[in-house]
Amino acid sequence: MLDISLIMLGAGNSSRFELPVKKQWLRIGSDPLWLAATKNLSEFYTFKDIIVVSKECEYMARFAPHYKFVTGGDTRQQSLKNALNLVSSQFVLVSDIARPCITHELFSKIIEGSKQANCVVPALKIADTAYFGDEVIDRDKIKLIQTPQLSKTNLLKQALETDTLYTDDSSAMRAVGASVWHVLGDERAHKITTKSDLAKIPCLIPPSNEHFTGIGFDAHEFERGRELWLCGEKIEYEFGLKAHSDGDVALHALTDAILGAAGLGDIGELFPDTDAEFKGISSLLLLQEAYKKVQSVGFELVNADITIMAERPKISKFKRKMEANIAGALNLAPNRINVKATTTEKLGFVGRGEGIAVIASANLKYYDWTK
């Protein structure tokens, strides 16, 4: 049995994918795509190490703590070099998280090919006529290269010690004189690049219908000389709320609820009050940025409920406008947002009129990429 480690490349920004969710975070059942693709390959072989390359290592590690995670670079090649620093096995298998349907048949051909060369690469032939400029190319000489690719680790590390950028491992291996062996690829190993590719991937199943609830709470004291903002609405009052941002305590609680439902920490981690960039900033902008983050990892908001606790000022007449502000910022129907107001019956700092407290809940579901 060969000594092999697996590297899964998934640090791209999905710029060509054209959906609010990054492709690596599309849910296949309950698993994000990167995890589904990694599990698929790990069912075929007992790898020495499984290394996932990402820009979100800490968050990913919560899904698979038994894997190793490494931060990706600006290019595929730099990402691979970063991962290779953790590899000590004789061979390394490199694949993309965007190829979730690798078959056991293809995997076996790649492993068997290790007897033939230093690098084994799946490749497809083309059936269509091909041109380069105005010249017809002999299509029998054209190969469409796929992953996973199996290489001798020491040679691949050597091959990548260059400023020349390569788009796959075999190109780098050829450049240092390593032998390369092609095995017949598989159409089912198609790579997801744009959203139209999803229809070409046979093994994908729709996201599960699980829902996730988050709770957020925040409280601020009144401060004279500041504007009072609640749910993106300016309220005429003699006091505002003391804060680093605009002090919109309701949006802070809602932002925490949304982040919490996705397991993405809290508003203070994303927008620390020690950062001058966020001094006086609109909390609607912070909410939008937080929601983009939540969307990027595969969630969408179903509904949110906000309870504002204030002895004064009276805000009942502003509730519908507040709901519309939030719905507009998040591109949702207003009926998905509910704002309530209450007092604390003269109890506590709220009852004494010293400030405002808010509790919010948010309900998320997986983004449905099948629509």
Curated annotation (Swiss-Prot):
Catalysed reactions listed for this entry: 2-C-methyl-D-erythritol 4-phosphate + CTP + H(+) = 4-CDP-2-C-methyl-D-erythritol + diphosphate; 4-CDP-2-C-methyl-D-erythritol 2-phosphate = 2-C-methyl-D-erythritol 2,4-cyclic diphosphate + CMP
One term of GO molecular function: 2-C-methyl-D-erythritol 4-phosphate cytidylyltransferase activity
Enzyme Commission code: 2.7.7.60, 4.6.1.12
Signal peptide: none
Residues annotated as binding a divalent metal cation: D218, H220, H252
Sequence similarity: In the N-terminal section; belongs to the IspD/TarI cytidylyltransferase family. IspD subfamily. In the C-terminal section; belongs to the IspF family.
Function per UniProt: Bifunctional enzyme that catalyzes the formation of 4-diphosphocytidyl-2-C-methyl-D-erythritol from CTP and 2-C-methyl-D-erythritol 4-phosphate (MEP) (IspD), and catalyzes the conversion of 4-diphosphocytidyl-2-C-methyl-D-erythritol 2-phosphate (CDP-ME2P) to 2-C-methyl-D-erythritol 2,4-cyclodiphosphate (ME-CPP) with a corresponding release of cytidine 5-monophosphate (CMP) (IspF).
NCBIfam families in the record: ispD (TIGR00453), ispF (TIGR00151), PRK09382.1 (NF006899)
Protein name as catalogued: Bifunctional enzyme IspD/IspF
